[in-house]
A protein has these predicted regions:
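Conserved alpha-helical elements of the SDR catalytic core
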Residues: 30, 37, 57
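Alpha-helical hydrophobic helix detector
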Residues: 14-33
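Conserved catalytic core of two-component sensor histidine kinases
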Residues: 20, 47, 54
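Aliphatic-rich helix starts adjacent to a transmembrane/signal segment
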Residues: 33-50
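Compositionally biased non-globular segments, especially hydrophobic aliphatic-rich helices
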Residues: 15, 44-47, 69
Length: 126
């Protein structure tokens, strides 16, 4: 027989279900936002690598009097993990194109044009 003065402690089933429902709602909000943060980080990584590769292209030109068509030969430049860079260059200009598999349909293209003095970086959805 139970002692009427002793009260049992603990959570009811309803209280536990309410807590589980609240956690589920918070997870449903947070998980898609986390994916968006990751994609923005990948996009920033591509843009940064394109700018850094362009700076390295200019350093390469100062040494060789031509631009490199191989991103791996650029002095002092190492691309970030996951970033795909394509460099094309000749004696007068270069183009660098960057993508990342974590940011589908996004591409950055850095185009130099020393004759006009207006190099530009264009990053956009493809």
């Amino acid at each position: 027989m139970r002692d009427p003065r002793r009260r049992e402690a603990g959570f009811t089933l309803i209280e536990l279900l309410v807590v589980v429902a609240i956690i589920g709602i918070l997870a449903a909000i947070a998980i898609p936002q986390f994916g968006a943060y990751r994609e923005r980080a990948f996009r920033a990584r591509v843009e940064s690598d394109a700018r850094n590769a362009a700076t390295a292209e200019e350093a390469y030109f100062a040494e060789a009097n031509t631009y490199s068509s191989d991103c791996t030969t650029l002095p002092g430049f190492t691309k970030s993990d996951g970033v795909n860079l394509t460099c094309t260059g000749n004696a007068t200009d270069f183009t660098i194109t960057g993508t990342h598999p974590g940011a589908p349909n996004f591409q950055c293209t850095y185009t130099s044009n020393p004759a006009s003095g207006s190099p530009n970086l264009v990053c956009a959805a493809t």
